[in-house]
A protein has these predicted regions:
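C-terminal alpha-helical "lid" subdomain
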Residues: 1-12, 178, 187-272
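Walker A/P-loop NTP-binding motif of AAA+ ATPase domains
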Residues: 19-214
Length: 272
């Protein structure tokens, strides 16, 4: 139902955010650092408050929500337990609810076995915490039962729980107060996007990257896709040269599914 991600296996990545997101992400890094987290949980417990930290990261695809959680795990040296929604949900009566219970039981067991409290990550959480409907069939009843258990688990949660979603409007309102922090990830502005381009393509002239940024607005995830395509073409074609036309064409391709543009020319790379 989930996989363990060890902090040492997570590649370090520099992430770029707009001011508000950066401020909140930095707060999360400070909160779950070993010394601060232990102090926070002790103080909260002393004041009769629940010790769990629950966070919802929401916003457009490719804005760094999942990678943010991975970097939180790396910098705080915490294991990440990544829940697999497709394996939690079951067609068998009662099994989805049992799976949720087993997941949290396993989290508690793992937390006792480790030196540092792990992070429980529900990626694309709308599959599990989407809006509930009137019970029309057994599937609806099963989903509602599972969500009631999940609500109860989060109400009494002790640890670090982070959920991500691209579809915040689909999340059931009952989960609103279960999240201590709700952080919105916007598509980065021009200057932030330029910094991402420079990090991904340090050998390309800044003027070229600035020109691309002024014409095409992409997310960090889309720029990473371009970087991967460039790497593939560099491997496949000897004496491959990256030029502005080639990068612009790849940038435009990333927007095809958003129905913003239509390609009219072949990809403009040069090779000998």
């Amino acid at each position: 139902m989930f996989k363990h991600i060890e902090p040492v296996t997570i590649p370090e990545k520099k992430l770029f955010f707009e001011f508000k997101e950066k401020e909140m992400v930095n707060k999360l890094h400070r909160m779950i650092g070993k010394d601060n987290f232990n102090l926070l949980t002790q103080r909260l417990e002393k004041q009769g408050m629940k010790k769990g930290v629950t966070v919802l990261l929401y916003g457009l695809p490719g804005t760094g929500k999942t990678e943010t959680v991975l970097q939180l795990g790396k910098t705080s040296n915490r294991f990440i337990m990544l829940a697999d929604a497709s394996k939690i949900r079951s067609k068998w009566v009662g099994e989805t609810a049992r799976n949720i219970k087993e997941l949290f039981d396993e989290y508690r067991k793992t937390a006792k076995d480790l030196d540092e409290t792990p992070i429980l990550l529900f990626n694309e959480a709308d599959a599990l915490i989407g809006k509930r409907h009137d019970v029309a069939d057994r599937g609806d009843q099963e989903m509602n039962t599972m969500q009631n258990i999940l609500l109860e688990e989060l109400e009494n949660f002790e640890g670090i729980f982070i959920a991500t979603t691209n579809l915040v409007d689909n999340i059931d309102k009952a989960f609103d107060r279960r999240f201590l922090y709700k952080i919105r990830f916007e598509k980065p502005g021009t200057e932030t996007i330029f910094q991402i381009w420079r990090t991904k393509f340090p050998k390309v002239k800044p003027a070229i990257l600035k020109n691309i940024c002024s014409k095409v607005t992409l997310s960090g995830g889309q720029i990473e896709n371009i970087r991967k395509k460039v790497t593939i073409d560099t491997i496949l074609h000897e004496h491959f040269t990256v030029n502005e036309a080639y990068l612009m064409e790849l940038a435009q391709q990333e927007l095809l599914l958003e129905n913003r543009i239509h390609l009219r020319h072949p990809i403009g790379f040069t090779r000998k």
